């Protein structure tokens, strides 16, 4: 998804020297220790965005990854930037179980109200929903469920829904009419805000959500 951003930033010779980035999540263990290598989101961001930008890239000191020691610094850093006039843009996808970042639906049951839930800035070593693991096996691990970590570090509602603007994408369509994301998209847009469906708060933010036509339905059985 970064290919065109890289293309136009380089074509127009636009510098990212005033851009600050905060990766929303990272694979981790129960203690928040993160993975390295090709499967990590840090590696993906560096290889798809930062490195291809060359001289136009985001300064290294402005790059934030959801590591155990760095994730807790996000609220203060973001608040300071916003106080200085920065705009916070949320770039997101919608998970199979309607998570944003890795803020899973079952976390909602831990709180007595949406207001309390909305005040959570991040979580280290969060346990992932089984369908989240299966989704990532399909999309990122070439079907190898056993390679997908069961936990992750993630930002929470307090940070994601403080965004001034949101840009989302839903492209969970496979071949021959198969897909995994249609119901998740419908729930996001039609259910109404609730802490039990994280992405249901997305329509409360200004922004744009791009989706593939087939995800819009009808969501009817079709033998493949």
Residue positions per predicted region:
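Ligand-binding beta-strand-loop-alpha-helix segment within the catalytic cores
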Residues: 12-89, 146-147, 211
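ATP/nucleoside-binding phosphotransfer catalytic cores, i.e., glycine-rich phosphate-binding loops
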Residues: 154-224
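Short, catalytically relevant binding-site loops at active-site mouths
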Residues: 96-99, 107-108, 174-175, 216-217
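Gly/Ser/Thr-rich active-site loops/lids in small-molecule metabolic enzymes
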Residues: 104-140, 145, 187-202
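Catalytic cores of processing enzymes, dominated by hydrolases/peptidases
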Residues: 122-163, 168-169, 181-182
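Conserved acidic residues
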Residues: 85-91, 164, 207
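Glycine-rich beta-strand-to-loop/alpha-helix junction loops that act as flexible
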Residues: 1, 92-96
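Active-site histidine-anchored catalytic micro-motif
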Residues: 2-37, 86-87, 100-127, 150-151, ...
